[in-house]
């Protein structure tokens, strides 16, 4: 829409439909895919970026699979290596907790999962589904200090505007599930 410097591109699962219907996604080969928990493959992707001189802007991971492989989880070792590599290369780490947040482990964030409590937070983490009680359109993004410093107010248009009723619902959900 002319607001972003570069449009985000989806992973392999959405590539076909986007290529067919959106000209800006055609002939793009900018997504790199690594199998969850394959640390050697993850390291190889970042090494390839170094060797070929390209920058990985963002690594996205879903800590507990929803649709693709329900219940499959990333390991702490994989998460830690992803965090290390993204920091070392200046990339952002995004954790997609849209489906799993609250439901997958009974807590909101990946850094609250059992065995992950002392893990370093991601740069961005997203939530929706359980947080909005299945009632109102609401997605939430949590930003680390580094990611917040990169955020430019006004660039993201209506995508990032508020919905007061949905926010009230999320607050009520959080109050109900917070010990």
For each of these PLM feature ranges, what is it?
Residues 1-57, 77:
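PLP-dependent aspartate aminotransferase-fold enzymes
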Residues 115-150, 162-167:
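Active-site PLP attachment segment
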Residues 54-56, 90, 122:
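Local beta-strand N-terminus motif with an aromatic residue
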Residues 162-179:
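Structural motif of enzymes handling amino- and sulfur-group chemistry
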